[in-house]
């Protein structure tokens, strides 16, 4: 399902011109007990008039299946909405991957390397549960130009149960949109994950035109929901932007946003048309999926 969403695969996919080298063993011919040991091959993938090539090697061990594949993609587009990435049609690209699957049906993506022109996405030790949710990962590297023609250079690296997020440039607009819409049905991570992301990014776009500089701090998740945050950054004119999230003893999530330069925030979220200057102080208290918010606008 995960690869179907990335590659936009549908029921019209056909596999042809396949060459296979199969190794197997039989413990009893009378019982027709045949065990696949390995499979090596290459095929062409054909869908809606588009043709691409895949080479693969599959091995079946005691309690584990391992797959190594190289996919050459030219015709087919690739879209990753969460990070605003798109590979257009008729652009040479490749995906190299190695994954293992165990008897519990969880999948470990040992390595994925995607390359297309000057774009590269790298994932290491990404573990996916049988429900298609992410359990954890070791490293993610993003180096690409997105659909908004903005450069992205970001590294997310595991540190025990937490993650360190560093980079020079990143367009966070789609992740912000996703966070505002997130619910229990579309969570990326497994429900019992408790993680802290320590952030240090030089330049973060909140939309195509507006950005903040030197974003530092941390955000924390409890049971896959944001429950703590302490982030500070600066707009290009030097004005500070602060975001704080805390969980009270009554299980209330209190969110506070403060800045003396509200124009980019107002443009991004359309709080009040025409409001450009002054002080923006936003506070929200959420409990049991019910939010009560107060927006204070002063000195404008």
Where are the language model's segments positioned?
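Membrane-proximal interfacial segments on either side of biological membranes
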Residues: 1-300
């Amino acid at each position: 399902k995960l690869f179907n969403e990335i590659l936009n695969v549908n029921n019209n996919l056909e596999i042809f011109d396949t060459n296979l080298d199969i190794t197997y063993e039989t413990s009893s011919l009378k019982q027709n007990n045949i065990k696949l040991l390995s499979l090596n091959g290459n095929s062409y993938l054909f869908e809606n008039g588009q043709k691409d090539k895949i080479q693969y090697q599959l091995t079946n061990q005691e309690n584990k299946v391992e797959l190594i594949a190289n996919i050459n993609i030219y015709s087919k587009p690739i879209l990753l909405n969460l990070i605003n990435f798109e590979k257009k049609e008729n652009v040479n690209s490749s995906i190299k991957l190695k994954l293992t699957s165990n008897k519990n049906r969880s999948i470990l993506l040992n390595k994925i390397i995607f390359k297309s022109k000057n774009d590269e996405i790298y994932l290491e030790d990404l573990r996916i549960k049988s429900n298609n949710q992410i359990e954890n990962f070791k490293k993610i590297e993003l180096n690409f130009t997105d659909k908004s023609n903005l450069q992205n250079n970001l590294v997310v690296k595991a540190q025990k149960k937490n993650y360190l997020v560093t980079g020079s440039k990143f367009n966070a607009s789609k992740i912000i949109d996703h966070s505002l819409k997130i619910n229990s049905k579309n969570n990326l991570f497994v429900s019992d994950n408790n993680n802290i992301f320590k952030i240090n990014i030089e330049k973060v776009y909140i939309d195509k035109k507006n950005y903040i500089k030197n974003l530092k701090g941390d955000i924390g998740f409890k049971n896959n929901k944001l429950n703590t945050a302490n982030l500070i950054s600066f707009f290009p004119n030097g004005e500070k932007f602060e975001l704080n999230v805390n969980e009270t003893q009554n299980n209330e999530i209190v969110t506070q946003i403060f800045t003396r330069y509200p124009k980019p925030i107002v443009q991004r979220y359309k709080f009040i048309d025409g409001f450009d200057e002054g002080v923006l102080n936003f506070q929200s208290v959420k409990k049991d999926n019910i939010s009560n918010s107060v927006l204070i606008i002063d000195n404008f």
